[in-house]
Structures are given as C-alpha cells and as structure tokens.
Amino acid sequence: MVLIRVLANLLILQLSYAQKSSELVIGGDECNINEHRLLAIVYTNSSQCAGTLINQEWVLTAAHCDGENMDIYLGVHNESVQYDDEEGRVAAEKFFCLSSRNYTKWDKDIMLIRLNIPVRNSTHIAPLSLPSSPPSVGSVCRVMGWGTITSPNETYPDVPHCANINLFDYEVCLAAYPEFGLPATSRTLCAGIQQGGKDTCGSDSGGSLICNGQFQGIVSWGDNPCAQPHKPALYTKVLDDTEWIQSIIAGNTAVTCPP
C-alpha cells in the first residue's frame, strides 16, 4: 500500500493513496540545529507538511500539501522551545504546474508558495538555492522533516529528524511498484535504502531531498508502512521545473510547466 505522506489535523490519518503525505523521517536522528535553516513547516486545516525556503519570499513544497488556511513556520527546531528568530507566515499566493491543480504519482506534484511577508536570514533561517545540475545515481542524499519516526504505528517527535539515503535509477522504483502502472520514464527521483530502515514518512511530504549540497527533490510518495526493504520513495525532480519556478518568482505568473 502506498502512502501520500500527510498528517491530518486533529486526527492523524494514514492515507493509503500513492502520495507521501507529510511524514517524519524513519531511521534518522535529530537534525543538527544548523542544518535545517531551509526547512519550513506547512500547516493547513487538514494536514501538516514540510517545505523548502528558496528565497526570502518563496517556499517550495508538494502539490498534495495544498489546503485551506495555510500557515508556514520557519526557524523552528524544538516545538517545546521558541527561538527569537522563529517566523510565522501565511500563503499570499500559491502556484501549481497545472491550473486544475492536478498531479499524479509521477508528475507535477509541486507547489510554489509566496509568503505574505518576506522572512529575514537569521541564525535559524536561510534559503537553499535551486539546483544547477542533475544528481548522479548512487549519490548519498539527505532528507529531513517533522514526520513520524515509526511506521505503521506513528510517533511524532518534538524536533526534526534527518537521514542519509541513496539515489537510485528510476527503474528501481518502477520495479518496486508494478501495481501502479508507472510510466517507463518519469520526472521523479527514486531514493531510499534497499535493505529498508530509513525513509521519509507521514508529515515529511513537501520536504527536500538534498544531494551533494543541491536541492534536487521534493518528498512526494512512497510505501505504507514506510522504510520497507526494496520499497524506495519517489521525489519530484526540482531541476525539471527550475525555469517555471524562476519565471513565477520574476512575475510571469502565466508561465506553464514543461510538458
């Protein structure tokens, strides 16, 4: 069963659909307080996701994280401790690859959010640039999030967790999920640990996959339970949409994603 990795508000829901709702990192450790300055928490009436700050006014996340009354928080490390530079914002505008807001298991699970007020760079807040080159298969990549650290029973931590996973050829994910009829080629990245034990999971959706220091992927979907052997997760490929993202930020809001 595949999971869209999102945490439902009030009730923690495990969605048995082919998208990772926002999940916490399985098999990871508490992130160093200085390594997740880019990490946003994205709340709506019905879900919790993650996002990535790409400049002082814009956050990139997954399309399936969309919802009403969106709040975005940056600079948070411990939910029990408030830091002086924590920032809370609302979504002033949201942009999707398709005007219908459609997305699939393998394409266009991406949403660009303009914050109502820009944030300031600080000790705990800093953007991560868009990628300039594609990642290499075999790369060790970093994932981070506030999602559940256990699966299928869910345990949500007070601090974000980080883990290292491997980038695979897309064919590995193609073979792992024959029941979903994935296309022969895809604009997603396939990443995980073949023996299992490390994975993104519930409430990590929309977070970043960072390979060799570059923001290469957005947490999209994966298996349920999470972190199973031979069941890597799929991540929206950021590089394919950089021109669209940059055009939106520049004010060309009529631009469309590449086909």
From Swiss-Prot:
Residues 19-259 form a propeptide. InterPro entries: Peptidase_S1_PA, Peptidase_S1_PA_chymotrypsin, Peptidase_S1A, Trypsin_dom, TRYPSIN_HIS. It comes from Crotalus durissus terrificus (South American rattlesnake). It comes from the Eukaryota. GO terms for cellular component: extracellular region; secretory granule. GO terms for molecular function: serine-type endopeptidase activity; toxin activity. Belongs to the peptidase S1 family. Snake venom subfamily. Residues 1-18 form the signal peptide. Pfam families: Trypsin. Disulfide bonds join C31-C162, C49-C65, C141-C211, C173-C190, C201-C226. It is found in: Secreted. This is Thrombin-like enzyme gyroxin B1.7. The lineage of its organism: Eukaryota, Metazoa, Chordata, Craniata, Vertebrata. The keyword Mitochondrion does not apply.
